[in-house]
Every structure is written in structure tokens, then in C-alpha cells.
Amino acid sequence: MADRLVRATAAGGGIRLVAVSTTETVREARRRHDLSFLSTVMLGRAMAAGLMLASSMKVRHGRVNLRLGSDGPLRGLMVDAGRDGTVRGYVGDNTLELDPVIDADGNHSFNFKAAAGTGYLHVMRDDGKGEPFNSTVELVSGGIGDDVASYLLHSEQTPSAVFVGERISSQQLHSSGGLLVQILPKAAEEPALVELLDQRCREIEDFSGRLDRCGDQLEDLLVDVFPDLDPRPLEDADASQSVNFHCRCTRERSVAALLLMGRTELADMLEKDGGAELNCHFCSNNYVVSGPELEGLIAELAAAS
């Protein structure tokens, strides 16, 4: 099943909804980075959140970066998501596993707080027009959903609910995705609707289970979560779009980046290693640069000096 993102409204247009399925996308990230169970879940949640944030950008080439900077053993993470449905990312420690925690109902879950530790969520929105918008908020839980909701409230003054979840077993990742809920400005002036939406969001239990049951049928997920709010997908080309893991790195860009190192360092690299091997943090692609290629770069720098 292909991953997708759905935009919808509810309560007669007073509520904005965005739902995303990222199962195949996160599986690809896990394969590329050889991620542990915990790091798979953390990165997957951030990918879903990044895509949902990017979905509201007005320009097709707009992008959102989420960076978790913290003192926990995960050593942070980074996600780059686009309005076009592409996303990539990495974690600081792709092998991290911690003992699970048990909630009041006896269910086991990942210890996101211990993995993330204390720190900040940094968000950058770039629409390609002038300087990107940057904002930083303190981490709330490390589970990504609450942290992104805090960003939306404090940095964009938009009260929101952000749900992210997954189903994972010792065999594979079964499902992954998220749901963004926002009340629109005019509807925010209706206390009864605000109270009803708040109540419905608090009543959502086992979001991961609901997501898993609905699969990529995100319209069914919206009805399952908000049956009495009449959720309806948008009636235009933006109602639904595909989502996939995609990295913009290329060999040409990577080789060109070597020029920034300067002649002295490149000459030292040539003498010691006879070439270079470049690795992209976002997708783990490796690019090998031969000795003659390095010599050509050194000559190019010499000619320009």
C-alpha cells in the first residue's frame, strides 16, 4: 500500500484535519539507516509530524525541518519534509534500545522521555521567499506529538492536537502515521465547538491501534476518530497526495561540497587515503571519489586562487 496524506475539514469547515500514512516511508528509512526498533519509531513519528506541518505551506516547493536537540541517549534527530510529500531524516544513535515502560493498563510502550531526555524542538519553515522562519520550543514529552503541538501553540498561536503512532513487532513495522487537528479562527469563537473538539481529542485512545486498523484508508480513520463531526476530504486536487522517502543528495553535489574543504585538506586526504568516501546523513548513500578526481578538484582550486 502506498503512503499518502489527506487534507480534510470537519464540523462544517470549522476544523482542519490532516492525516498521513508513512508505513512504507519509515520502512525505507529503517532499511537505509539500519535502525533499531526505538529509533525507527522516533524517526517515524517525526517524519509524520514534519509532513503534516509541511502540508499547510502555500508553495509546492516549501519545506519544513524538525530538529530535536537534546541530552538523551538518542542524541537527537533531524527530519526534512516537503509540501510535495517527500521526506528524509536521520537519528543520532540508530542502534538505541531502552527497556519499555508499562502504563496504568499494563500496556508496554517505548520510553520516549528517556530516549529524548531534556532539550528543545527546533522548527524551520522555508517557503523559498527570503529568510526561513525559525522557532524553538522546549521538549514536552519527547514523543513528538505533544512537542509539535506545543510548537504550534506557542510559536504559531494555533491550538492543535497532534497524534502520531505506529504498530511494530519483532518481524516488521506494520503501520505508521499521524493526525493533525486544528480549529480554524472563526470556529474558535464558538465555545461549544471548541469544548466538543477538546473532549473528542481527549477521548481518543489507542491512536496507534486505530491507525493500524484503517491502514492507508485515512478517510476511514477520520470518521473513526470523529464520527459526530462529519469529517470530509477537501474537494480539490489538494485533497490527497502521495508520500515517500526521497533524498535530494546527488554525487555531483557531494563532490562539489569537497571544494569547501580547501586545497590543503584535500591534498592531505589524497596523500593519506588516496581518495574520499562521502556519506549522506539523511539517506546513508555513499559516494566514492577517486584519487584522480581529488587531483582535479585540487587543480580547480589552484586555478581559482
From Swiss-Prot:
Residue ranges of the TM segments: none
Listed GO MF terms: protein folding chaperone; unfolded protein binding
GO annotation terms (biological process): protein refolding
Alphabetical list of Pfam families matching this protein: HSP33
Keywords: Chaperone, Cytoplasm, Disulfide bond, Redox-active center, Zinc
SUPFAM superfamilies tied to this protein: Hsp33 domain, HSP33 redox switch-like
GO cellular component: cytoplasm
Disulfide bridge positions per record: C247-C249, C280-C283
Subcellular location: Cytoplasm
Posttranslational modification: Under oxidizing conditions two disulfide bonds are formed involving the reactive cysteines. Under reducing conditions zinc is bound to the reactive cysteines and the protein is inactive.
Family the entry assigns: Belongs to the HSP33 family.
PANTHER family found in the cross-reference section: 33 KDA CHAPERONIN (PTHR30111:SF1)
Job description of the protein: Redox regulated molecular chaperone. Protects both thermally unfolding and oxidatively damaged proteins from irreversible aggregation. Plays an important role in the bacterial defense system toward oxidative stress.
Protein name per Swiss-Prot or TrEMBL: 33 kDa chaperonin
Species: Parasynechococcus marenigrum (strain WH8102)
Classification of source organism: Bacteria, Bacillati, Cyanobacteriota, Cyanophyceae, Synechococcales
